[in-house]
UniProtKB/Swiss-Prot annotation:
GO terms for biological process: translation. Keywords: Ribonucleoprotein, Ribosomal protein, RNA-binding, rRNA-binding, tRNA-binding. Belongs to the universal ribosomal protein uL5 family. It comes from Lawsonia intracellularis (strain PHE/MN1-00). Part of the 50S ribosomal subunit; part of the 5S rRNA/L5/L18/L25 subcomplex. Contacts the 5S rRNA and the P site tRNA. Forms a bridge to the 30S subunit in the 70S ribosome. InterPro entries: Ribosomal_uL5, Ribosomal_uL5_bac-type, Ribosomal_uL5_C, Ribosomal_uL5_CS, Ribosomal_uL5_dom_sf, Ribosomal_uL5_N. It holds the Pfam family Ribosomal_L5_C. GO terms for molecular function: rRNA binding; structural constituent of ribosome; tRNA binding. GO terms for cellular component: ribonucleoprotein complex; ribosome. Transmembrane segments: none annotated. Gene3D superfamilies: 3.30.1440.10. This is Large ribosomal subunit protein uL5.
Length: 179
C-alpha cells in the first residue's frame, strides 16, 4: 500500500463520508485509473520522435506505452487511417497511486509560474483532465537528453458521480487547485 493510498483510506474516506453523508463506505468515490496521453500529430511521421515519446512516457509512467493510431483518414491533416499519431498509458492500482503522488508533490510544483491547476478540467461526471505543456517536469527524465519538448494530457478517472464530489476527493488528496 502506497503512502497516498494509505492517506486516502485513513483520512480522506472518513472526511468524504462525513461531508456527503454516505451511508455505506462503498459509496465514497475513489480514483479508478489515470490515463496519460501524448499526441504528436504531424511529428509522429518521424519514427525517431515517436520512439522518443514512447520511451519517455514509459519512463514517466513506469509501464510500457502503446502507440495510438488514427481511426479515420483526414485529407486536410495528411492523415490516413492506421497511421501512428501518439502514445498512451493507463495506470491502475499501485502504479496509479505512485504516479498521482509524484504528480502532485514533485512534478506540478516544477512547472514555471505555477499557481495551481484550474478547476475547469472536470467533465461533468467527476473525472478530471489537465494538460501539461512540457513533459520535462517529471523527475525521471534528464533534461539534457530531451530533444523535443512534448505536451501531455493526464486524465484522472474517479468513481464520483458529480464534479463536486470529484473536486473534494482530489482536494483532500492534495491536488493543488487555484484558490
Amino acid at each position: 500500500m502506497t503512502r497516498l493510498e494509505k492517506f486516502y483510506q485513513e483520512k480522506v474516506v472518513p472526511a468524504l463520508q462525513k461531508e456527503f453523508l454516505y451511508k455505506s463506505i462503498m459509496q465514497v468515490p475513489t480514483i479508478e485509473k489515470i490515463s496519460l496521453n501524448i499526441g504528436l500529430g504531424v511529428a509522429s511521421q518521424s519514427n525517431k520522435i515517436m520512439e522518443e515519446a514512447i520511451s519517455e512516457l514509459s519512463l514517466i509512467a513506469g509501464q510500457k506505452a502503446v502507440i495510438t493510431r488514427a481511426k479515420k483518414s483526414i485529407a486536410s491533416f495528411k492523415l490516413r487511417e492506421g497511421m501512428p499519431i501518439g502514445c498512451r498509458v493507463t495506470l491502475r492500482k499501485e502504479r496509479m497511486w505512485d504516479f498521482l503522488d509524484k504528480l502532485m508533490n514533485f512534478a506540478l510544483p516544477r512547472v514555471r509560474d505555477f499557481r495551481g491547476v484550474s478547476e475547469n478540467g472536470f467533465d461533468g461526471h467527476g473525472n478530471f483532465t489537465l494538460g501539461i505543456k512540457e513533459h520535462s517536469i517529471f523527475p525521471e527524465l534528464e533534461i539534457d537528453r530531451i530533444e523535443n519538448t512534448k505536451g501531455m494530457n493526464i486524465t484522472i478517472v474517479t468513481s464520483a458521480v458529480l464534479d463536486s464530489e470529484g473536486k473534494v476527493l482530489l482536494d483532500l488528496l492534495g491536488m493543488p487547485f487555484k484558490k
